[in-house]
Every structure is written in structure tokens, then in C-alpha cells.
């Protein structure tokens, strides 16, 4: 039986600090995002430092701190168009504090952001449970542990 074709993904990968490039190889980012996609997408992933992460979170969410991932979704159909902003120092700290590998944490946050870009949310408990279940399903298929366990 033939596997269904994966949705087309156009990816732009940007690093505010080139030192983060080695931690996040393009082929892995492509794999993680594609695994979470249900529709074609044009996604920019930007890895930022604390100052840029904090400024974006403050300006767009009125929260004056750097957060792990921000999703800016611009279009949902027929092609998802979105920016995923990950704050490297926050991601690194969380991975260390939670005893997870940095790779697994980046995979989780990129899957999480990709689901947001497709309309998933976690503001309401039922939606949060559905989104977490989908994240876990995708991450397990990629060979990672349940991030919520």
C-alpha cells in the first residue's frame, strides 16, 4: 500500500546568532515540521536570542519576557503561511531544567508551533488535550518520548 504524499513545505531557516546553527540542522527541522503538517505550508523558522524573543513577546502578546516559541500564522488555506520564532536561551534552559535532550525539546516546540500555525490551540482544556495528544503522536512517530509524561 502506498503512503500518502506529505504536504509540500517551503522552509526558510534563520539564525539571529550563527552559533545556534549547529544545534538545529535544516534536515531535522524539515523532518519535524513535515511530520506535523496536514496541509502545504510556507514556514519561516527564526532562532533568536533573549532580547529579540522578549521584544516580540512583549509587542505581540503584551508579555514582557522571552518565551520558548511564538507562532505568527498569516494564512491557513489553501497554504499555511507562518513564522515560528524560537528563543534559543529559553529552549536550552527548559531542556536542561526538564532533563530532556536539546534536540527533543526543539522537535517538540517546532511540532507545537506547526500545529498552532494550522489552527490548533490550547486555551480551552478540551483543545489543550487534543493538541497535546497530537503532539505526542507526532513526536512518538519521530522516535521521541512523550513530552508531557
From Swiss-Prot:
Q: How is the cofactor bound?
A: Binds 1 zinc ion.
Residues involved in Zn(2+) binding: 112, 116, 122
Example of a GO biological process term: rRNA processing
Q: Which Gene3D superfamilies match?
A: Metalloproteases ('zincins'), catalytic domain
PROSITE patterns (UniProt xref): UPF0054 (PS01306)
- Care to name a GO molecular-function term for this sequence? metalloendopeptidase activity
Cofactor annotation: Zn(2+)
Q: Which residues form a coiled coil?
A: none
Enzyme superclass (EC): hydrolase
Subcellular location field: Cytoplasm
Q: Which family does it belong to?
A: Belongs to the endoribonuclease YbeY family.
The record's annotation in NCBIfam families points to: rRNA maturation RNase YbeY
Name the job this protein performs.
Single strand-specific metallo-endoribonuclease involved in late-stage 70S ribosome quality control and in maturation of the 3' terminus of the 16S rRNA.
- PANTHER family per UniProt: ENDORIBONUCLEASE YBEY, CHLOROPLASTIC
List the HAMAP family.
Endoribonucl_YbeY
The identity of this protein, by name, is Endoribonuclease YbeY
Gene responsible for this protein: ybeY
Amino acid at each position: 500500500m502506498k503512503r500518502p504524499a506529505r504536504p509540500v513545505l517551503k522552509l526558510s531557516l534563520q539564525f539571529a546568532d550563527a552559533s545556534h546553527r549547529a544545534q538545529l540542522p535544516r534536515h531535522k527541522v524539515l523532518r519535524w515540521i513535515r511530520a506535523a503538517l496536514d496541509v502545504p505550508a510556507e514556514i519561516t523558522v527564526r532562532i533568536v536570542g533573549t532580547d529579540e524573543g522578549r521584544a516580540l513577546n512583549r509587542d505581540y502578546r503584551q508579555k514582557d519576557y522571552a518565551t520558548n516559541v511564538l507562532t505568527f500564522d498569516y494564512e491557513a488555506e489553501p497554504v499555511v503561511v507562518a513564522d515560528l520564532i524560537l528563543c534559543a536561551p529559553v529552549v536550552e534552559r527548559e531542556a536542561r531544567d526538564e532533563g530532556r535532550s536539546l534536540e527533543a525539546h526543539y522537535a517538540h516546540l517546532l511540532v507545537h508551533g506547526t500545529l498552532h500555525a494550522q489552527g490548533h490551540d490550547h486555551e480551552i482544556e478540551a483543545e489543550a488535550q487534543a493538541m497535546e495528544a497530537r503532539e505526542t503522536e507526532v513526536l512518538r512517530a519521530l522516535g521521541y518520548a512523550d513530552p508531557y509524561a
